[in-house]
Amino acid sequence: MLRFTALTTAQNRKPVAVPENGKRSELFAQNVFNEEAMRQLMTRDAFAAVMNAIHNGTKIDRRVADQVATAMRDWAISKGATHYTHWFQPLTGGTAEKHDAFFEPVTRDRAIERFGGGQLVQQESDASSFPNGGIRNTFEARGYTAWDPSSPPFVYGTVLCIPTIFIAYTGEALDNKTPLLKALSALDQAATEVARYFDKNVSKVTTTLGCEQEYFLIDKALANTRPDLMITGRTLLGHQAAKGQQLDDHYLGAIPSRVLAFMRDLEQECLLLGIPVKTRHNEVAPNQFELAPIFEEANLAVDQNSLLMDVMRKVAERHDFVILFHEKPFAGVNGSGKHNNWSLVTDTGVNLLAPSKTPIKNLQFLTFFICTIKAVCEYEPLLRASVASATNDYRLGANEAPPAIVSVFIGEQLTQVLDALEVSSDNLSPEEKTELKLNVVGKIPDLFLDTTDRNRTSSFAFTGNKFEFRAVGSKANCGKPTMVLSTIVAQQLTEFKKAVDALIEGGKKKEDAIFKVLRRYIKESKKIRFEGDGYSKEWEEEAARRGLSNHKTTPEALKENISEKAVALFESTGVLSKVELLARYEIGLEEYVKTVQIESRVLGDIALNHVVPTAVRYQNTLIENVKGLKEIFGDSYQEVAAEQLELIRHISEHIKVIHSQVEAMVEARKHANHLPDFEAKADAYCTQVKPFFEVIRYHCDKLELMVDDELWTLTKYRELLFN
């Protein structure tokens, strides 16, 4: 049987030898066309033009583009590249690339390597073949990819990969990068203006991001015996193993030797590509692990995380693993997330979300800290929508990840600081102001010396010098949640600046004006702050009283993206137009429908073509056994064969339910497929098709416990998770 052959194969595997290629610091970014490489290979004027484009967003003219392309081509060929590609991130959530050779014949007998500014700056692509929400049709398919100078090109394998944006012929964004860049630009502008209240030398604020990538590793031979794992990325059925994660013995435990070899190989690949991987460890669930890089500028961090997942898949294959990024591949053990650590840093080297040792710097910290909380309070439904997907629905609110309710955790000490600021008067005496600055604002750094609590049930937590958005799914593209978070904070900082300036014009001193607005924001955003157990029923009831949203399903959450408030936000900041928002709403619904549809088809197939035939085969064995007992014991056989007869009856009952439920699920699917639009289809798949999954699974899992282990064809949880 394939299952037992796969088990033997998995158990006999040895770690793949991974040669060390020198010091890690010397490997770093060898295959990246970064600032150092450009400085060495480009003219001074061309280098200055590219730096200006990266830091100030200025356009590069065709002459300079040709010089850059020539330097890039020569560098890439020296690294073994034979092809180039515009590497982009369409709304599939993954990456896309088309390889074109540098090779070009010039005569019948001679060829050269050619790559010019035209090929570097812009390429044409078929936009209708990617998710576009109706923006592009087959008969008007043209789309464009355009070079993003702020994310350095890299050589992977034999291909020069040039990070690009992807837009329609009519200008609408068809990717995750374009609106992200616009959001980061809006936040830079808004944050810089506010930061200049405290330091006139600030001319730029950069958003930083660090993505903690969780994943499962399963032996390839074992994974190949599970059609559900190979097609959907998760197990649609399977009884839980007797041992799961209840002993807490996997988290931070010794890394298995095969996995460690994979990690070492992966890290070397990542370092060559400039991905600054730092931390590796076992996660909570069996066969679950985490990799975390050092934070980077947000646009680059998003690119690197997308690249990282591609690299992880390829390296896993070399080590005879299948890597699972699905948010909930196994029932009964933790799923996987991707905590996004978000912060703001000035070009003067100050982290705006890190407390300082001086009251004035801490006032700056409080300004950005409180404005971020206020932004989350105002737009929490959009943050929830930014992480909504059919796969992440299985994880959110499952007592292992943040609930679907967005709340902000800041810890007891900072709560006390905000409470003290909230009750302070507008008309403080000089002595009271000094007291407030020295003993409340001034002592913030000291608070962090003893702050060790971490509320894992909060979706948005302050962790000392950054905010950690924990609701992001492990397979998600980080561009979407980062774009939304950056946009709402940009909008809030803009509103803050207007309010403070109005008070200053009215005669208030700058510091008093800032305190006044911050006090108002503390009061208005109090409902989003929560320090307790986010998993509890009491919090769900309390959140409802506070007026916080609780969108438990993706179709429900995605509706927030096209609300009047959302459209006004994204249009006013210039991040997304109403047309783009409507398109993304349709794309999100379509993806949800297709994901649930595929899972439904696979589940029905496995139930009827694997589980039921195996159960019938075992039932026939039992029937033959009962017949034999009857021959031996005569009329008293029923007493002797009571257990077998009961088992035969139970198997028939489970098979009957499976058949009827699969049939009903297929009919529900047919009904959903004939509904007029994706909004109706998504609601139908969510409320009418998906509920069958658990019922069918329950009866299949019961049969797994009854059927002879020697006959069961599907690899079991204990074998998948403990090999």
Model-derived segments and spans:
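C-terminal amphipathic alpha-helical interaction region
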Residues: 520-723
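Glycine-rich, acidic/polar active-site loops that bind/position phosphate-bearing ligands
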Residues: 141-325, 334-337, 344-586
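N-terminal hydrophobic targeting/anchoring segments and the immediately downstream early-domain regions
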Residues: 1-21, 138-154
